[in-house]
Swiss-Prot record:
Protein name in the entry: Carboxypeptidase Y homolog A
Disulfide bonds: 179-419, 313-327, 337-360, 344-353, 382-389
Propeptide: 18-124
Enzyme class: hydrolase
Amino acid sequence: MKFLTTGLLATAALAAAQEQQVLQAEDGMGQAPQRGSSIFDETLQKFQSSLEDGISHFWSEMKTNFKDYLPLISLPKKHTRRPDSEWDHVVRGADIESVWVQGADGEKRREIDGKLHNYDLRVKAVDPSKLGVDAGVKQYSGYLDDNDADKHLFYWFFESRNDPKNDPVVLWLNGGPGCSSLTGLFLELGPATIDKNLKVVSNPYSWNSNASVIFLDQPVNVGFSYSGSSVSDTVAAGKDIYALLTLFFKQFPEYATQDFHISGESYAGHYIPVFAAEILSHKNTNINLKSALIGNGLTDPLTQYPQYRPMACGEGGYPAVLDQGTCRSMDNSLERCLSLIETCYSSESAWICVPAAMYCNSAILAPYQQTGMNPYDVRNKCEDMASLCYPQLNVITEWLNQKSVMQALGVEVESYESCNSGINRDFLFHGDWMKPYHRLVPSVLEKIPVLIYAGDADFICNWLGNQAWTDALEWPGHKKFAEAKLEDLKIVDNKNKGKKIGQVKSSGNFTFMRIFGAGHMVPLNQPEASLEFLNRWLRGEWH
C-alpha cells in the first residue's frame, strides 16, 4: 500500500504550489502547450531559467512555515531486545563471511559474496497452534540484526502448504514507504485474515498454497521492526535485504535449493528494482533469484504521473471521479510537474526531487484525495482515512498488538502499527519518491523475468501508468514488447476455467498484466485471480 501525501505535506505542497506559475498557451484557454511545439520550447526555457530561484523559494518557505515538522529522522520505537538464548537459532554473518573456498581456477574466494560481518539472523520456530494461523504449516519468525547500525528487521516465514521440498520461495514486500508487510499477510495474500471478533480465518487463496512465503517488515521502524537509526532511501535498504536472504538460506539450506522470487506492491515498485539488482550483483551467492513481481507499483514517475488525470477523469475503464474543471486544472499543472521530475531524474538530488514530489502530489494527486473517494479503488468512497480507507487494518492492528501474539512471534517492540507516517516523510524529504529507479529494470531483465501486474480500479498506482512505463522502457526487447498486443487472461487452474480475469502482454523477459475488478491490492479484491496468475508465473508461463 502506498501512502498518499499526509495532511501536513499536502498543506505544505499546496502553499508552495501557490507560488508556482501554471504553464498556459497564449490563447488563454487554459490548455498546456504540447511538447515539441515552439510555444512549449520557449516556455520550457523560461521555466528552466527560473527553476533554481523557485526551488530556493520553496525550501525557504518550508523552513519558515514548517520548521517544527521537518525532522528528517523518524523517532525510534521503544523495544526490549531478547537475549540470544531465547532464540532457536542465531546465524552470524561474520561466520559466513569467513568461509573461503578454492574456485575452479585455483584461486581462493569467499564462498558467499557481500559485506555480512555486521549482520546476525535470529530465528524462532513459531507454534501454529498458539496463534491459529495456518495450523500444521511450519513457520519461523525473528529479526535480521545490523549490529553496527542498530537496525533490526522483523520477518515471518510460512512454508508451502503443498510441497515445501520442491515449491519455490517468495519474498513479499508492502510499500508505503512505511507500511508493514503484515498488512499483506492478513489483508491480502497470507494464510489467514482476522475477523471483527479478532478470530483467525483461513485464506484458501493464500500465496503459500504452492510456495513458501517470507513477509518482511522493512525498512526499519516499520511494523515490528525497529532501530536507533533510520533508513530514508531505497538504495540503503537493499543491503539489508541481501543480508537477510543470505543468512536465512544459510540456516535453512533446504529452501536455498528452490527457486526464489521477490515480489511486492505499491512503493515496492521502487524497492524491487533496487533489491533485485543488489542480489544479482553478487556472483557467489546462495540466493537462487528467478524472477521479480511488482503489483500496482510506482516505478517511473515521469511516465506514470501523466496517467493520473485520465484515470480520475473517466478514461481508465471506470466513471470519472473528478469534474471537467478539475481535470483541466490537472492538465494545466502537468507540464510543470513533468519538468520538475525531469530535473530530478537528471540530478537525483533531494534539493530538486523533494519540490518535484511536493508540487506534483499537490497538483496531480490532491484533487482526487479531496473528493473523499478511495484512492486505492475508484469504485468506493474512503471509509476511514486514518486507516487508509480500510477499517479492517484496525482489527489487524489490534490482533497483532495482543501480548500473546507478540510473545509467540518473539516481538521486541512495545506496539505494532500498520503504517509509519514518519518513514513516509523521511523518504519523501530525502527525495526518494521521484527518483528514476526504473533505470535498473533493463539490467534486471538481462538476467531474470519481470512481471508488472496492476488492478485496474486503482488510482494511486493505476494500470494506465504501469502500462505506459512498461511500454516506454528502453531495453533490448523494447520494440517487440511495445508492439505486443494485450490478450485475454483466463483461468485455467480450477472449476472456473475459462473465466476472463484480465489481460496480459509478454515479450522476452517482460510481462504486463491488467487484472479486472481489482484495486491497489489485487489479492484482496480478486484473490482467485491473484493466486491463478501467481501459480502460473512461478511455473514459468510467460517467460
